[in-house]
């Protein structure tokens, strides 16, 4: 197997919003950066595999609230270049934006699988990844490594202290529902409106029942639809279910769609709705949160 070696000042794992911002920030401060992404596409949850919207329009109570800095610059670049208004155009706009950073090099389809530490075990010396594009292994060496993978793959491979799962009660003790939510899965769906009614019958293989979901997840979906019908909507599962870790995107989306079309307060309005598309991958809460020198709380 072919083996390559890369040296840089910083290695960033994951090219979602956090990874892109970290890599671009470091490159603009003068560091040489290697950005690793296991998938063939940029964007993470806003990429064309997961298809979450970049920004939920109207999701804030403050009319003029917006992100500034690199996120604002990124969004402006997407709005300017994504003339198609779809995820393919968005991914192209992100790629063009990142390629403009001379000190940043992107490695797509590069899966991290090994971490080498120093003799005392308190510092990462190198990471090893398999690259489909380069057809072999790549050793990445740098003084600093940033884990933006979403699943904590670098942190877990390096045996950094941390925890898995979702523990809202740790910081939200005042929340009445905090202890009830132990698992979160999410997908996205795109809705269009037809000129004529379209009936829907739930497939027999879908085991989830939307009424078993947590109340907050059901309300979030209805509020999103009340703001605007056509477009992309986030669908979450916060309730109890068998084989929670194996909840598929199709099960989640079709259970929500069955509820909307046949039993929800919006059933009459939903007669002409069509499910145009949904994300093939499901995001869940079973990631790894490393315990660092600083911990961000909900406050």
Predicted regions and their residues:
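Beta1/beta-strand and adjacent pyrophosphate-binding region of the FAD-binding site
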Residues: 4-16
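Active-site-proximal beta-strand/loop segments in catalytic clefts of secreted hydrolases
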Residues: 13-16, 36-39, 130, 148-150
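Conserved N-terminal/central alpha/beta ligand/cofactor-binding core
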Residues: 25, 31-32, 36-118, 163, ...
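Flavin (FAD/FMN)-binding glycine-rich loop and adjacent Rossmann-like elements that form
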Residues: 45, 121-124, 132-144, 148-299
């Amino acid at each position: 197997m072919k083996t390559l070696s890369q040296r840089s000042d910083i290695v960033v794992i994951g090219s979602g919003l956090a990874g892109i911002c970290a890599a671009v920030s470091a490159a603009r401060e003068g560091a040489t950066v290697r950005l690793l992404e296991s998938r063939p596409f940029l964007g993470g949850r806003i990429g064309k595999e997961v298809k979450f919207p970049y920004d939920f329009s109207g999701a804030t109570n403050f009319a003029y609230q917006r992100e500034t800095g690199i996120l604002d610059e990124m969004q402006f670049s997407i709005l300017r270049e994504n003339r198609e208004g779809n995820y393919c155009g968005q991914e192209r706009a992100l790629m063009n934006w990142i390629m403009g950073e001379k000190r940043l090099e992107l490695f797509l389809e590069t899966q991290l699988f090994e971490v080498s530490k120093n003799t005392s075990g308190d510092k990462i010396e190198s990471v090893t990844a398999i690259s489909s594009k380069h057809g072999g292994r790549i050793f990445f060496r740098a003084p600093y490594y940033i884990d933006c993978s979403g699943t904590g793959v670098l942190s877990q491979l390096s045996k950094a202290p941390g925890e898995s799962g979702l523990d809202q009660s740790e910081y939200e003790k005042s929340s009445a529902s905090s202890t009830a939510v132990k698992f979160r899965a999410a997908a996205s769906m795109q809705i269009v409106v037809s000129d004529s009614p379209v009936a829907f019958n739930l497939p027999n293989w879908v085991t989830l029942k939307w009424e078993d979901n947590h109340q907050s997840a059901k309300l979030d979906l209805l509020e999103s639809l009340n703001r605007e019908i056509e477009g992309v909507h986030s669908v979450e599962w916060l309730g109890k279910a068998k084989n929670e870790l194996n909840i598929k995107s199709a099960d989640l989306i079709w259970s929500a769609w069955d509820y909307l079309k046949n039993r929800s307060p919006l059933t009459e309005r939903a007669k002409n709705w069509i499910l145009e598309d949904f994300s093939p991958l499901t995001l869940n809460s079973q990631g790894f949160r490393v315990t660092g020198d600083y911990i961000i709380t909900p406050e």
